[in-house]
Amino acid sequence: MLSQGEILRNPSRTRLQRPPKSRSERKGWWYRVTIFLTCLIPNFMLRCFGMTTPEVQHAWREKVALCICIFFCWIILGFTTYGMNTIICKGSNQYVASRLKRDAFDGNTVIANGGIYYTDDEYAFGENHTYAFEKKSGACKLAFGRQLPSGDEDIDDLERINDIYWDWGDIMSKGMIVVGNKVYDPSYCTEPLFEEFNRKYAGTEGKPDFDTDEWRCYEDMFYAGKVATKTPGCLLADTMFWITTISIFGLIITKFLLGFFYSWYAKRRPKPSPKITPCILLVTCYSEGKDGIKNTLDSLCKQDYGYDYKLIVVICDGNITGSGNSMSTPDIVLGLSDVDRRAEPKGYISLTHGTKRYNRAKVHAGYYHVREEKKSRRYRCWPCFGRQADSSEVENYKTRILVINKCGNPSETFKAGNRGKRDSQVILMSFFSKLIYGDRMTELDFEIYQKMKFLMPHIEPEDFECILMVDADTIVKPDALSIMVNVFETDQKVIGMCGETMILNKFESWVTMIQVFEYYISHHLSKAFESVFGGVTCLPGCFCMYRIKIVTNQQGQLLSGPSKSRASVPRFSSMKSILSSSLEKSLCLPILANPAIINAYSVLEVKTLHQKNLLHLGEDRYLTTLLLKTFYRRKLVFIPAAKCETYVPGEFSVLLSQRRRWINSTIHNLFELVQVNNLCGAFCFSMQLVVVMELFGTLVLPAAIIFTFVMIAVSILIEPAWVPLIMLVGIFGLPAVLILITTMEIQYVFWCLVYILSIPIWNFVLPTYAFWHFDNFSWGDTRKVDGEGKEDEEGEFDHTKIRIRELEEFLSEANK
């Protein structure tokens, strides 16, 4: 992506620059790697398959290059799992008595005289039979004047296979003695001279104290083989095996323990929030239906938070009519709200190319009402002749609302105004940045400023400190906003957070059922573990909250809530008055409104496959990545007490499309985080190592599930591999234990079993599909609209249509 210097030089919406002169682009190392890996496929072949433009062709080449790199990762995993022992270790050809398999030989075998031989007779397999064969030793005759007792079989008549080796388990159990690297079996020794030596060193390493002839006699008569030792290859294989095993299992155990600790810690009831920190409740709409939008706005309107300190902002991303809807999304939102519809379209600079870079939006200000009927307790009434009747109470909720409808420029015909969710978010992010830094504004910025002042005259627009972002199909629990704001007020290091997303349609289909446990462990295991270090790598866009800015005094104390040290400063004085106050000097640190964040997030030239996966498919996750990279000393956390509900895909094709976007954006964002050296921890005990392991684990998921099934089959049919099996039980068992402990609900055992049965889908089908569609940047079946497939022609951007002025200039013009 962009360097820090390029980010700061990146033109924001406050400046208009001349189109840059054409120049040859610098080709980086990845471009050269891509061309090298796909050099056997010429461009004319790609044109035959419909890939006509250079951008599409290079995106396809990047996809193939990435798939080749992923395949290499699979080979590395397979080699470390199976190939290392087979190739490196077994090349030593050591015949260890305890590891011999009868089926590995063409006939009967016998172990004797330090070797293994083929024989026609039957001998106990794996035992030492040296005593059965005749042995003559000149050293024995010199030492004792006779030969020691031995068998009468002639070993010279047998075919020798190889030397025999004994491991220490056999040596100790059979009472053998080791001297040097040689193993001796004194079990059939009857010579009194050797009796004390045999008794003293049985099963251990001996230290002989005999003369030369006596010891040579002992060697000739009782030699049984050599000590089984590991070759350098075996040592390397074992070292790699235990390093990976300890690392993976250590990460699993650590995640479990820290996830449990964080769950317990987060359950501590926080102090009640005064609920006076000004908050924006942002809802981004695209093609959602009326019911989904209404449920979301109702839930935000009913938030248990001060009426004067919250403002709902709905941004409709173009004149879009969702599939199955009778009205466009802007008409649905306006129909649900009590707003002034007499709004003029105002221009701004959008995140796209050509004529579409000039976009317009209408800003409607008003109120959103919810009338809810609640049943109270039953009572007996006289007209009911003693029967019980229900009494009902009507509760009315009212919240200020600002509707921003991106309507497009006059030349647009299809999907007028549609510029994407990232463009909608940057509208507000850049608006607050311009207020804080005093930068020039567009007409749309000033329109938003005026409507905010009209709706909330007691608050300056720059006084908003937090922004809650939700999708238009999310239902937020009534206490979620106050819980999240309270975290901001009590911990100034927290700059972003997410809550728990729960599934509403659990039993709609098998597709929804397999997602229940996956959603739960992604929050209470992964995000809880990351929260301990303050580095949640993904704050989901459907339900998250960010600081717009942090205001502190000179001692670093927050000024965003009631504080004794701030008694002399009015609560809702404007940002400029706070900064210029002679009573107490304050410091303002922009977070979401920081130019480093906005400029990197609003990159216009998105050319590479990596950039497109970051900014077109995973913009919410990339915003989290930018915050981690920029504010690495602050915290992004998961708050389990703040909850929301949503509907998940009920059809497999929709799930496939959704997870394609999520998996691909995850890979590219993790690659960005791998390059951040300032994450929490150091070396082997750092979040950077965890990110590396998660990235590699994501890439090898399909291969890992295949190897898992192979391991299970081998364990059942041949011999159990206990260490991998224990690790497998830990991977699937510990999350279930964690969830049972944290929820105390037995139903999650059922959801865990459903999830385990669907592991091939999660670990093979979805990742494999996502990898092969690296170059697909569409939203697929996740968001369908009527008339999909049409596109307006792209012309040249006319910057003269955009009016950019200082706020004071706009105000003076408006007051004339």
UniProtKB/Swiss-Prot annotation:
SUPFAM superfamilies in UniProt: Nucleotide-diphospho-sugar transferases
Membrane topology classification: Multi-pass membrane protein
Keywords of the record: Cell membrane, Cell wall biogenesis/degradation, Glycoprotein, Glycosyltransferase, Membrane, Sporulation, Transferase, Transmembrane, Transmembrane helix
Gene Ontology BP terms: cell wall organization; chitin biosynthetic process; sporulation resulting in formation of a cellular spore
Cytoplasmic side: 1-32, 85-240, 719-720, 767-816
A Pfam match: Chitin_synth_2
Highest taxon of source: Eukaryota
Location of region: Disordered: 1-21
Principal place of residence: membrane
Catalysed transformations (reactions): [(1->4)-N-acetyl-beta-D-glucosaminyl](n) + UDP-N-acetyl-alpha-D-glucosamine = [(1->4)-N-acetyl-beta-D-glucosaminyl](n+1) + UDP + H(+)
Single GO term (MF): chitin synthase activity
Cellular compartment(s): Cell membrane
Record InterPro entries: Chitin_synth (IPR004835), Nucleotide-diphossugar_trans (IPR029044)
Role summary: Polymerizes chitin, a structural polymer of the cell wall and septum, by transferring the sugar moiety of UDP-GlcNAc to the non-reducing end of the growing chitin polymer.
UniProt family annotation: Belongs to the chitin synthase family. Class IV subfamily.
Protein's name in the database: Chitin synthase 1
Species: Encephalitozoon cuniculi (strain GB-M1) (Microsporidian parasite)
